């Protein structure tokens, strides 16, 4: 199964905000990350579920030459796949191998290409 996510992939770890509930601080995902997550959920819903995953191959294409942390972006993608119901969980027993690579800069079409290979 191949899925393409359009646009810049936000880093989940660097997109946090602190709110206060009952006088206690609570760290939550930022509005920007939530908007991206919700938008992409609509794009990938209905793609089907992969029961037995051999590996997941993620290739990221950036819109510019700014430095970015690939593993943080991969975490956003893996959480999206779980929340959309495409994979059951992203732990190593369900997904034994994740291959992550930088595909280069594509100013016109930044994206993430995700290939999920079944056992």
Model-based region annotation:
Residues 1-119:
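Acidic, proline/glycine-enriched N-terminal capping motif
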């Amino acid at each position: 199964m191949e899925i393409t996510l359009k646009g810049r992939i936000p880093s989940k770890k660097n997109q946090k905000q602190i709110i206060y509930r009952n006088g206690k601080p609570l760290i939550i995902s930022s509005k920007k990350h939530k908007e991206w997550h919700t938008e992409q959920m609509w794009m990938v819903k209905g793609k089907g579920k992969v029961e037995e995953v051999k590996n997941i191959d993620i290739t990221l294409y950036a819109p510019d030459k700014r430095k970015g942390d690939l593993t943080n972006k991969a975490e956003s993608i893996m959480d999206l796949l779980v929340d959309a119901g495409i994979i059951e969980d992203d732990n190593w027993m369900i997904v034994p191998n994740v291959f992550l690579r930088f595909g280069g800069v594509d100013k016109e079409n930044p994206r993430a290409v995700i290939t999920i290979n079944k056992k």
